[in-house]
């Protein structure tokens, strides 16, 4: 209910105004405390790139992180990714992912990134601990922090905000009146605002998600699926995924949305999706692989960004490393 209010303006929003004012005060004081040195923050010995957003809900950060890993690897860097590990409970922290790591341990997004890229990935509530582990044990020379824009305990060199190009900033108000974690003025302080879908504004970078052929959740083999299908998505904004399937021409019979990072029940999914082929997101697939049926598929997507933006980023990173004597 409240999320629907975030993308409209009505008198109901004002019921939350006192809480939004308190939220604004607390977030402002917290950020000032870090900037003034009242709260301690960690400076990594290698450049840190943060990918985040200022709104609640899915905006497409993970595809952006995957794009960065691929770009930096091709440029000769050894990137590592750190994350909070939402939805997972690791045996200890910091936790370095390995081939047998499950989403229940590290969270669905870190496992997706590790399986897709093969780069070092570490999770920890205190991201500085994850950074230290990657630098000391894996020899990474650049850190990508997934969803850490408001995690000011970790100092950063480059910040990117990923924005949903259709929903954008909703009604423009802070939580809980609206979807904003920080005020819109925060966008002026980042290196780039990346617009996922929709139409980027002149000062933004356009990003599009290119779908790849469906892959089987169990075997990872590609195939063409025709006829009626079901679809499920446990992501920040499921309608984006469902709409992408419809645009590709799939005859979607049933659309089922789950909460972001939700742990799935195998018996419930088997009962609900037993009649037709099921298409899910890659993020959901990492949680379903151990109990997937033969006709369950996932849709990989790849972020596409302008070449000029990639060149600009690599130049900025080279300058940072030169200035630090790396």
Curated annotation (Swiss-Prot):
It comes from the Bacteria. Pathway: Glycolipid biosynthesis; lipid IV(A) biosynthesis; lipid IV(A) from (3R)-3-hydroxytetradecanoyl-[acyl-carrier-protein] and UDP-N-acetyl-alpha-D-glucosamine: step 6/6. ATP binds at residues 55-62. It catalyses: a lipid A disaccharide + ATP = a lipid IVA + ADP + H(+). GO terms for molecular function: ATP binding; tetraacyldisaccharide 4'-kinase activity. Its EC number is 2.7.1.130. Keywords: ATP-binding, Kinase, Lipid A biosynthesis, Lipid biosynthesis, Lipid metabolism, Nucleotide-binding, Transferase. Disulfide bonds: none annotated. InterPro entries: LpxK (IPR003758), P-loop_NTPase (IPR027417). GO terms for cellular component: plasma membrane. Transfers the gamma-phosphate of ATP to the 4'-position of a tetraacyldisaccharide 1-phosphate intermediate (termed DS-1-P) to form tetraacyldisaccharide 1,4'-bis-phosphate (lipid IVA). Belongs to the LpxK family. PANTHER family: TETRAACYLDISACCHARIDE 4'-KINASE (PTHR42724), TETRAACYLDISACCHARIDE 4'-KINASE, MITOCHONDRIAL-RELATED (PTHR42724:SF1). This is Tetraacyldisaccharide 4'-kinase.
């Amino acid at each position: 209910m409240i999320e629907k209010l975030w993308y409209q303006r009505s008198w109901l929003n004002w019921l939350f105004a006192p809480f939004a004012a308190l939220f604004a005060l607390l977030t402002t004081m917290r950020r000032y405390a870090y900037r003034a040195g009242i709260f301690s923050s960690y400076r990594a010995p290698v450049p840190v790139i943060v990918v985040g957003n200022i709104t609640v809900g899915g905006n497409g950060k993970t595809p952006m992180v995957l794009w960065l890993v691929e770009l930096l690897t091709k440029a000769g860097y050894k990137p590592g990714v750190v994350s909070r590990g939402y939805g997972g409970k690791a045996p200890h922290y910091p936790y370095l992912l390995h081939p047998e790591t499950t989403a229940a341990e590290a969270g669905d997004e870190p496992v997706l990134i590790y399986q897709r890229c093969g780069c070092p990935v570490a999770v920890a509530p205190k991201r500085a601990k994850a950074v230290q582990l990657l630098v000391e044990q894996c020899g990474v020379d650049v850190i990508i922090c997934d969803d850490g824009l408001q995690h000011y305990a970790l100092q950063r060199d480059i910040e990117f905000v990923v924005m949903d190009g259709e929903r954008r900033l909703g009604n423009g108000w802070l939580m809980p009146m609206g979807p904003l974690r920080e005020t819109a003025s925060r966008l002026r302080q980042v290196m780039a605002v990346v617009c996922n879908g929709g139409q980027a504004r002149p000062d933004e970078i356009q990003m599009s998600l290119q779908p790849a052929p469906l892959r089987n959740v169990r075997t990872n083999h590609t195939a063409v699926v025709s006829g009626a299908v079901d679809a499920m998505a446990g992501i920040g904004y499921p309608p984006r995924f469902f709409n992408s399937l419809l645009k590709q021409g799939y005859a979607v019979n049933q659309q089922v949305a789950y909460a972001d990072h939700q742990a799935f029940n195998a018996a419930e999914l088997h009962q609900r999706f037993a009649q037709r082929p099921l298409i899910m997101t890659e993020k959901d697939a990492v949680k379903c692989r151990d109990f997937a049926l033969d006709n369950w598929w996932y849709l990989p997507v790849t972020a596409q960004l302008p070449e000029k933006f990639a060149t600009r980023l690599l130049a900025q990173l080279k300058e940072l490393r030169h200035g630090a004597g790396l």
